[in-house]
């Protein structure tokens, strides 16, 4: 008889461990086993399982493997949830954890309706988010390379007499420095070159964002955000790429809660602590 099946998947880089449980509180889960973390292997499992099920409900935890499995399954017409790991109910006395138990737990909790789904971004939004995060990585790398160069200069008592660091005059001054030992000269030049390379990387990624934003579905919202004082193109794109579709928030309070900009309280007895 065809039944509704809930399928818990413990997803790793190379494998997916699968547990299946039928609807109905008396039904017990069973371990299907592990398959390769490849879409072809997942399709084969679906073809084999769907013949004995009225509906399949998949679930796996959000993690480093991303949303590829979710998008593939939903495009095939299956129901799939990506569960928030921080919201999964835990048993305090449970000291055993392995892939099979995790898959069974996900299947059980999904059947019971006790899991909370994470927001899965649109593929184009996620692509823009990858680009803005790549730029942020470049900004961090540039800042650290500047700090290392500054530390080298300070350690060797080299002080710039000009007013503004990282200006053309500053780099001209750097190029005129002659260190007493060849090894130090090589080190100085490497620090300088690294700063130049990282700054070029930041500029290159910034230009790419400017070129790609007009074709992005959220381009009108980017323009609207820029109407606010102090909000540049990069800030607007970064915020929207991280938040995704703003219509998923029913009201401003939900958006503020998502960002963590809500009051908190940790009080007990006479101790009152609000933040």
For each of these PLM feature ranges, what is it?
Residues 1-275:
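A detector of single, family-specific signature residues
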């Amino acid at each position: 008889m065809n039944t509704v099946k809930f399928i818990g998947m413990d997803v790793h880089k190379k494998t997916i461990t699968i547990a299946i449980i039928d609807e109905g509180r008396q039904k017990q889960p069973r371990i299907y086993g592990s398959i390769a973390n490849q879409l072809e292997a997942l399709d084969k499992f679906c073809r084999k399982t769907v013949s004995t099920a009225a509906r399949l409900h998949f679930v796996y935890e959000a993690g480093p493997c991303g949303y590829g499995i979710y998008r593939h399954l939903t495009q095939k017409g299956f129901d799939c949830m990506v569960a928030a790991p921080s919201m999964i109910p835990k048993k305090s006395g449970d000291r055993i954890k392995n892939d099979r138990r995790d898959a069974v737990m996900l299947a059980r909790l999904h059947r019971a309706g006790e899991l909370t789904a994470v927001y899965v971004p649109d593929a184009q939004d996620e692509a823009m988010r990858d680009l803005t995060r790549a730029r942020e990585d470049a900004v961090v790398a540039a800042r650290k390379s500047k700090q290392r160069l500054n530390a080298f200069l300070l350690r060797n008592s080299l002080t710039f007499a000009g007013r503004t660091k990282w200006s053309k005059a500053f780099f001209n001054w750097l190029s005129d420095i002659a260190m007493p030992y060849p090894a130090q000269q090589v080190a100085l030049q490497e620090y300088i070159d690294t700063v130049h390379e990282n700054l070029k990387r930041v500029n290159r990624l910034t230009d790419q964002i400017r070129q790609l934003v007009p074709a992005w579905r959220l381009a009108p919202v980017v323009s609207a955000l820029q109407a606010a004082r102090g909000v540049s193109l990069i800030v607007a794109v970064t915020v929207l790429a991280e938040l995704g579709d703003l219509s998923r928030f029913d009201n401003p309070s939900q958006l503020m809660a998502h960002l963590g900009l809500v009051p908190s309280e940790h009080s007990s007895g006479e101790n009152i602590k609000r933040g």
